[in-house]
Every structure is written in structure tokens, then in C-alpha cells.
């Protein structure tokens, strides 16, 4: 790469999961809409055909009249080919297939355990991690061997364990994880400012927050707008909308698999005094017992949904059809940013403007009362010198036990996956607050789910 007139040219980005029909398209749009970077994106995917399809789509986006930078998209046949010479590595993969995820999400329902997402914690999150961690061992080793100085951006869930595995295998890796859940809570605060004070068109980025926690279970203990403390306004709003909830935009929780009425957020704030900063579907899965997920009827009372794998399979077919339309020109390309910040973080690391954003990185003291090497979600400063976490301060005493339980479970999940330790795996599985079963029931469910994901497990699990 080289610099010319406040632009960086001849960059190489390796995209692992380059056949993605979601994250990849958004990333391509963001690159095309930014004039300060250009180069090559090497698409690597075990589904080679999907990568070939995205090569066509990516080059169409780059050639669009509204594109303000030029990127060349190519297909890499191997990880080595993709990674060699890379300045940045982006990872967004589906670990396994939706058939395995069907077991992750729905097998526990036979035991009265309902999951709204099933990709981070709970029984489903644990099993997804068992598949994902071996894949990330391979990816980390390849980055170590072929692009040790590249910056690595992860989008895959379970986010915490993906980033934790990368650092465990290659401690000198320069990796961080990006998640947009915090953005959604900042956006909620802009709407509350409109509703309560008539302040319209407040930008999400103007809501300044202190972020602390772990991915999908993050908290704000400070939130301001132009120096104004937003906590009193949020408390008033949460009390007024506790029963009804609050939604904005064109979707609502009854017709969207991802939407919610924010009742879980309001409830958590009134219980604990901090703003829970993720979607209700994610937050619910971290809480003890059956607080929000006792039954489908209880979930409806809290005004969010259980995202079924059947819905995901149908939505995949829609994305496959859209891929075809984009490739053939039946659907015109429209250049528009997707709201993510990955490309902006790249620019900051290249020296094209400092940026503070929430990311998932090793703790290293940012949250004083969580383990040093645990991966946490906090604000960090991005610039030419690298990534420096902002000291978030300790978690409040009433929230710490909720978060710490998952932190230690995640550490044990990593160890169990790396060592194929069935005993540690089972005890970690049973220690999740959503697994409200007796020992025999829990072991039966664990064995069933492990069997259902066996195609992606190291052979030592069957020893």
C-alpha cells in the first residue's frame, strides 16, 4: 500500500467468509462510498461458488457510476492465497449450517428452554462455540503464518469467543470484533431526545456513552448529549413506557424477527440503574433462569420474538435470489452505506482520522473487576498508532455477578473446545443461567446437541 493525496492506495483486504450474502455486501458498499481507500479484496470461502458470485457483485459495485473509489474483487482458492500480503483481514463466517443451528436453537425447547437467538450464550451459544473455536484456531494459525501484521476485524458470533480464540492461538495478533448492538441503543436515545425534548435529527454518534461489559451484554453507566446527562430522561421514559414498550421506524416486534419494543432494556434499567445496550433478544439470553424466556407467551409479553431457524432458512433463500438478481443486473446496484463502522476503523488505523468506537478486545485492565485476558466490549481509540482501549472503570457491584458468570463460562468453553474435555464441557453447559435443568436432563440435552453438531467437532470428542 502507499499514500497519495490523503488517500491510501493498493491496499489488500482478505475476506474470510467472502461468499457472505449479508456482511460482505454491506462492506463492499461502504468501501465504494469512501474516496480515501482503494485496492484489492481477496474473497475466500469454503463455498467457492458463493465467493465467485460475490466477486461478480463486488466488481459491479466498484464499477458503479456512484462509486468514489476503485476496488478489485478476486477469489482466493486457499487461505494462504487470501492472506499473503493482506493489510486487513475481515472474518464473517457461518460456523456450520442452519441444520446445526436448528439443533442449537430448537433442541432445548423439548426441555422447556427457549432461546431468542441462540448464537452467543445459553445451550445454543455453547454448541455454536464448539464448532466455531476449531475453525478459528485454523484461521488464527493461518494469519500468524501468512499475514502476522495485518489488522483483523471479526464479525462472527459468538463474538467474544471468536476474538478470544484468535488471541489465544496467536497472542501478537492485532484483532478486534465489531458489533452494531450498541449503535441501536444510541439510536434509541436519539428518539427519546426527540420524544421528550423535541430535539430532532440528533446523530447517533453525538450520543456519548461509556461502554462496559461483554458482547451482547453491554451496559452504559454514562450517556450524554452535548454535556447533558441522559440518565434522568431515560429513567422517566422507561417508567412511562414500561408496560407499553417503545418502537420507532417501519418495523415492529410482531412482524420482524429482529425488532423489539425495548421492554427488556427498560426493565433492566429500573432493576440495575444502568442502560443495557443491546437488542432485547440478546439481553434476555444472559439473564438468570427464566426472567424473560420462560415460554413463548412470556416472550410475547416482553414484546420481542424468538428468531426461528426456519425463518433464517427462508431468509437465506431470499438472499440467494437477491444474489442472482444483483449478478444478472435484474436488480440495480445502489451505492449506500450500511451503517457499520468497519471501514471507518480501517481508515483510522491508516492515519486518515482518529475514531472512538465500541469494540471487542482483550480487557487488559479496561474493566478493572474482570479478568485481564477476557475479551470485553468497551470504547477504544483508533488511530495510526493502533487500538487503545478507554478505561471504562469497574462494573457496578450489582451487575458484576451477571457478567462475570458468563466471562468465566466463556473461558471454560474455550478450554473445553481446545481440549475436547467432555466433563468440563458438560459442567460449563450446566452452569449457564438458561440451562435450568437437573443433572440428568442437562446431560441428556448436552449429549444430544453435541451429537447433532458432531460433523464439525474434532474426532477427539468421540473418544
Where are these regions (language model features)?
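A short, basic/flexible loop-to-alpha-helix module at the beginning of a structural domain
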Residues: 1-10, 38
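Rossmann-fold dinucleotide-binding core
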Residues: 151, 155-226
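Redox-cofactor binding/interface segments in oxidoreductases and associated redox assembly factors
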Residues: 84, 90-91, 154
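Rossmann-fold NAD(P)-binding glycine/threonine-rich loop
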Residues: 99-169
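N-terminal Rossmann-like dinucleotide-binding module
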Residues: 11-44
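Short acidic low-complexity segments
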Residues: 72-85
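Glycine-rich phosphate-binding loop and adjoining beta1-alpha1-beta2 segment
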Residues: 33-67
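Long, compositionally biased stretches enriched for glycine and/or charged residues
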Residues: 197-463
Amino acid at each position: 500500500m502507499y499514500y497519495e493525496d490523503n488517500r491510501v492506495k493498493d491496499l489488500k483486504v482478505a475476506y474470510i467468509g467472502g461468499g457472505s450474502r449479508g456482511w460482505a455486501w454491506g462492506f463492499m458498499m461502504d468501501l465504494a462510498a469512501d474516496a480515501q481507500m482503494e485496492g484489492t479484496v481477496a474473497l475466500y470461502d469454503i463455498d467457492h461458488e458463493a465467493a465467485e458470485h460475490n466477486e461478480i457483485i463486488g466488481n459491479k459495485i466498484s464499477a458503479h457510476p456512484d462509486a468514489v473509489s476503485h476496488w478489485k474483487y478476486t477469489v482466493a482458492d486457499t487461505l494462504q492465497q487470501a492472506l499473503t500480503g493482506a493489510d486487513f483481514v475481515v472474518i464473517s463466517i457461518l460456523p456450520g449450517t442452519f441444520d446445526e443451528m436448528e439443533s442449537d436453537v430448537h433442541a432445548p425447547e423439548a426441555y422447556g428452554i427457549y432461546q431468542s437467538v441462540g448464537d452467543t450464550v445459553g445451550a445454543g451459544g455453547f454448541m455454536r462455540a464448539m464448532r466455531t473455536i476449531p475453525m478459528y484456531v485454523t484461521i488464527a494459525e493461518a494469519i500468524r503464518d501468512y499475514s502476522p501484521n495485518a489488522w483483523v476485524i471479526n464479525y462472527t458470533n459468538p463474538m467474544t469467543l471468536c476474538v478470544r480464540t484468535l488471541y489465544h492461538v496467536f497472542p501478537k495478533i492485532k484483532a478486534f470484533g465489531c458489533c452494531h448492538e450498541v449503535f441501536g441503543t444510541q439510536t434509541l436515545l436519539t428518539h427519546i431526545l426527540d420524544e421528550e425534548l423535541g430535539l430532532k435529527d440528533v446523530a447517533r454518534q453525538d450520543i456519548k456513552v461509556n461502554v462496559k461489559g461483554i458482547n451482547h451484554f453491554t451496559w452504559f453507566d454514562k450517556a450524554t448529549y452535548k454535556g447533558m446527562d441522559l440518565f434522568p430522561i431515560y429513567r422517566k421514559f422507561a417508567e412511562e413506557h414500561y408496560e407499553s414498550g417503545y418502537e420507532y421506524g417501519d418495523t415492529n416486534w410482531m412482524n420482524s424477527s429482529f425488532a423489539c419494543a425495548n421492554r427488556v432494556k427498560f426493565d433492566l434499567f429500573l432493576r440495575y440503574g444502568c442502560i443495557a445496550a443491546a437488542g432485547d433478544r440478546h439481553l434476555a439470553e444472559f439473564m438468570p433462569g427464566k426472567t424473560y424466556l420462560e415460554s413463548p407467551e412470556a416472550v410475547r409479553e416482553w414484546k420481542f420474538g424468538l428468531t426461528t431457524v426456519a425463518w433464517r432458512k427462508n431468509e437465506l433463500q431470499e438472499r440467494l435470489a437477491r444474489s442472482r438478481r444483483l449478478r444478472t443486473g435484474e436488480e440495480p446496484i445502489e451505492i449506500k452505506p450500511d451503517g457499520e463502522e468497519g471501514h471507518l476503523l480501517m481508515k483510522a488505523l491508516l492515519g486518515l482520522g482518529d475514531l472512538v468506537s465500541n469494540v471487542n478486545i482483550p480487557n487488559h485492565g479496561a474493566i478493572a473487576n474482570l479478568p485481564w485476558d477476557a475479551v470485553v466490549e468497551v470504547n477504544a481509540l483508533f488511530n495510526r498508532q493502533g487500538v487503545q482501549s478507554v478505561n471504562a472503570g469497574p462494573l457496578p457491584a450489582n451487575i458484576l455477578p451477571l457478567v462475570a458468570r458468563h466471562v468465566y463460562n466463556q473461558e471454560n468453553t474455550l478450554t473445553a473446545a481446545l481440549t475436547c474435555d467432555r466433563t468440563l464441557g458438560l459442567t460449563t453447559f450446566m452452569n449457564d443461567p438458561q440451562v435450568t435443568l437437573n443433572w440428568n436432563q442437562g446431560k441428556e440435552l448436552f449429549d444430544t446437541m453435541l451429537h447433532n453438531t458432531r460433523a464439525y467437532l474434532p474426532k477427539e470428542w468421540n473418544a
